[in-house]
């Protein structure tokens, strides 16, 4: 092979490596997005299961006539529904996200934390009460 053919071959390989590097970067970005979505869906699933278990625990009351006719919820059923909603559930979800390695601060929300390093913005948010 002459020198020009070798140079062309090396240049071609360099272009292919550049394209592979670009594809690898795109794959990494897509993987990060899928991990974030998976985490969000897992938290939502857990939340819905908790709500379902709470609704199963509350004994179903017979439907009042007023509620059946007018679609108005009786006051004691309203209270039962309000008790099912957990206070601080959003805070618990943020803590869980942070423990799983994601930012919960408004600066980097949802992005993975590098090497599980602490973020001062996230910590200040989680320490507010």
From Swiss-Prot:
Binds 1 zinc ion per subunit. Keywords: Cytoplasm, DNA replication, DNA replication inhibitor, Metal-binding, Zinc. It is found in: Cytoplasm, Nucleoid. It holds the Pfam family YabA. Its cofactor is Zn(2+). Its main location: cytoplasm. InterPro entries: YabA (IPR010377). Signal peptide: none annotated. One of its GO terms (biological process) is DNA replication. Zn(2+) binds at residues 103, 105, 119, 122. This is Replication initiation control protein YabA. It comes from Listeria innocua serovar 6a (strain ATCC BAA-680 / CLIP 11262). The gene is yabA.
């Amino acid at each position: 092979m002459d020198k020009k053919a070798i140079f062309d071959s090396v240049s071609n390989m360099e272009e292919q490596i550049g394209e592979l590097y670009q594809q690898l970067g795109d794959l990494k970005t897509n993987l990060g997005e899928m991990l974030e979505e998976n985490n969000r869906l897992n938290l939502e699933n857990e939340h819905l299961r908790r709500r379902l278990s709470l609704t199963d625990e509350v004994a179903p009351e017979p439907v009042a006539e007023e509620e059946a006719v007018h679609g108005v919820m009786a006051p004691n059923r309203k209270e039962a529904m309000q008790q099912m909603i957990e206070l601080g559930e959003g805070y618990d979800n943020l803590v869980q996200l942070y423990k799983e390695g994601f930012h919960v601060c408004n600066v980097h929300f949802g992005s993975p934390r590098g090497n599980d390093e602490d973020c001062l913005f996230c910590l200040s948010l989680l320490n507010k009460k």
